[in-house]
Regions:
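Active-site mouth of glycoside hydrolases
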Residues: 56-276
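Aromatic-rich peripheral "rim/lid" segments of glycoside hydrolase catalytic domains that contact
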Residues: 351-418
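Sec-dependent bacterial lipoprotein signal peptides
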Residues: 1-20
Length: 545
């Protein structure tokens, strides 16, 4: 009886437990919500990073050397740093301050037609900046205009920072020393930023050059610390500073973007020194210590040096230049950048025209063969000849372009004799002088000088000044009317007239037109002369209609 009862209880308990185990659990209570409250939208999917814009496609530095052809320097034009003027905005006075005519599109057309393919435009900036380092807009606009003249005819153009470097302790604010770099780095980088932004959209035919001939604190030429008797520590610091300036230049230009991201850039050795010669063991140090700047793009940096060998002994010149070119290949080209000789000419005094033409033709041809670019320093169309325009040294110009293009090339070389001309002279200052002759005059062969103006000056405005063969020997000639003849007095001057000028005697400047100038030989025959600026004036050749 009990056992049956107990079995029923156990069975009931077992059944109850089983039912409870199989009964589903109540769901958890939901949080109360406000039906009017908006449910936040899920976070948006992150947008993919935009693809970087492709860099412009520019020719490499080596291709630029080939494509630019042979070059010339528009010297003493946009780089004057002392002219007696203080207003850095007045570009015309600065551009003509060192005796050159105002640059024109016609001049660049002439250079192109003669066979030149590139123009280096030296530019000074420090005298054209305000106290905050901002370039005056008037000056930047003029630089831009001259650059456009070059590019308009399909030539290449190089612009730089020029006489902000060099030997002038007062005006050359860029110095190759660690202290100089630390002191002027911000101003230097800010200047290049302004230039780069102005020209960032220009194409591959515009190149930037970092600095011209930067020297150490001792203003040493040839190699760093030369003027100090050589101090290895000073020299090392100077070469490091050159590399630092070059790196700053590349970094700043690249950061401005646009076409500047791949523009071909030129960096110069210390002092633009080329390592030529064997008279000192340190001569090659500027080449050995020059480093290729780090760059975001490959093959868009060129090196630059300058070269002015003596050419009285042509065989010696060729040996020296050949060794120089070998060294440029060894120390610079081997780093992955081509070389341009951004200035070349000669330090020989009064070299023969025959020697100069031989040198010019050989130098350009040999550099071309080696893939080295060349830019002759001035001395082809200078001073008033640019205003025609025509060549002042036509034989040298022809030698240069034939050295590059070959003897079969026929250049267009206009000369002054092709034109009927007058000379427009602008005097700026009291005592300014115009050269009436281009060289000294032997008084044993010549008896006087005669000239004609377009109109008579006022009495006392001008006189002729003749410099004798010694200091203090001077003859003065007064005149009135549109023409004058001055007879030389050997008892006053001696055997030679070193210089003959037309001098201004009034304040406030004056503009005159000289129609012709002739020396009078002892036999009475006339020899034409070409007037030119001596100081304080400019000359523009005006072609007669």
């Amino acid at each position: 009886m009990i056992s049956i009862f107990m079995r029923k209880i156990f069975a009931f308990l077992f059944l109850t437990i089983g039912v409870l185990a199989c009964t589903p659990q109540d769901p958890p209570l939901e949080e109360e919500t406000n039906p009017e409250e908006e449910i936040p939208a899920p976070d948006p999917e992150p947008e993919p990073e935009p693809e970087p814009e492709p860099l412009p496609v520019f020719e490499t530095s080596f291709e630029a050397i080939t494509n630019m052809g042979v070059g010339w320097n528009l010297g003493n034009t946009l780089e004057p740093v002392w002219t007696g003027d203080t207003d850095g905005r007045d570009w015309r006075r600065w551009e003509t301050g060192w005796g050159q005519s105002v640059t024109t599109q016609s001049l660049m057309n002439m250079m192109k037609n003669a066979g030149f393919g590139a123009i280096r435009v030296p530019v000074s900036w420090g005298v054209h900046m305000d106290t905050d380092g901002k370039v005056y807009e008037e000056w930047m606009n003029r630089v831009n205009e001259v650059v456009d003249y070059v590019l308009n005819v399909g030539m290449y153009c190089i612009i730089n920072i020029h006489h902000d470097t060099g030997a002038d302790e007062e005006l050359a604010w860029l110095v190759a020393s660690p202290e100089g770099y630390a002191r002027e780095r911000q101003k230097y980088e800010n200047l290049w930023k302004q230039i780069a932004l102005r020209f960032r959209d220009y194409g591959p035919r515009l190149l930037f050059e970092s600095y011209n001939e930067m020297l150490d604190e001792g203003r040493s030429w040839c190699f760093a610390s030369y003027s100090l008797g050589y101090d290895a520590g000073v020299a090392s610091g100077a070469y490091q500073a050159i590399n630092d300036y070059a790196q700053s230049f590349v970094d700043v230009v690249r950061a401005t973007g646009g076409n500047n991201a791949v523009r071909n850039l030129v960096v110069n050795t210390y002092g633009a020194c080329n390592g030529a010669g064997d008279w000192n063991s340190h001569l090659q140090d500027p080449l050995k210590n020059m480093k290729m700047p780090k760059d975001e793009v490959e093959d868009h940096i060129l090196f630059q040096v300058h070269s002015y060998p003596k050419i009285d002994d042509l065989a010696a010149m060729e040996r020296e230049v050949t060794q120089m070119l070998d060294d440029l290949e060894t120390y610079l080209v081997s780093q992955g950048g081509p070389v341009i000789v951004g200035e070349w000419g000669t330090f020989s005094e009064n070299p023969s025209l025959e020697n100069y033409c031989h040198y010019a033709r050989w130098f350009v041809s040999e550099c071309k063969r080696r893939g080295i670019g060349t830019f002759h320093w001035m001395n082809l169309s200078d001073g008033m000849y640019r205003s025609v325009p025509c060549f002042s040294s036509p034989e040298i110009a022809e030698a240069i372009v034939k050295g590059y293009h070959g003897d079969g090339f026929t250049p267009v070389i206009p000369v002054i004799e092709d034109f009927d001309i007058d000379y427009k002279v602008t005097y700026r200052d009291l005592w300014s002088e115009l050269n009436l002759t281009s060289s000294s005059v032997d008084l044993r062969e010549y008896q006087g000088i005669t000239f004609e103006l377009d109109q008579a000056p006022a009495e006392g405005q001008l006189h002729v000044k003749v410099y004798g063969d010694e200091d203090g020997k001077e003859q003065y000639g007064k005149f009135s009317g549109v023409s004058a003849t001055i007879s030389f007095d050997p008892s006053v001057l001696g055997d030679e007239a070193k210089r003959i000028t037309l001098q201004l005697l009034q304040e406030g400047g004056l503009t005159i037109t000289v129609k012709n100038v002739h020396l009078i030989r002892k036999d009475g025959t006339l020899e034409p002369c070409t007037p030119s600026p001596f100081w304080g004036c400019s000359v523009e050749i005006v072609t007669r209609r």
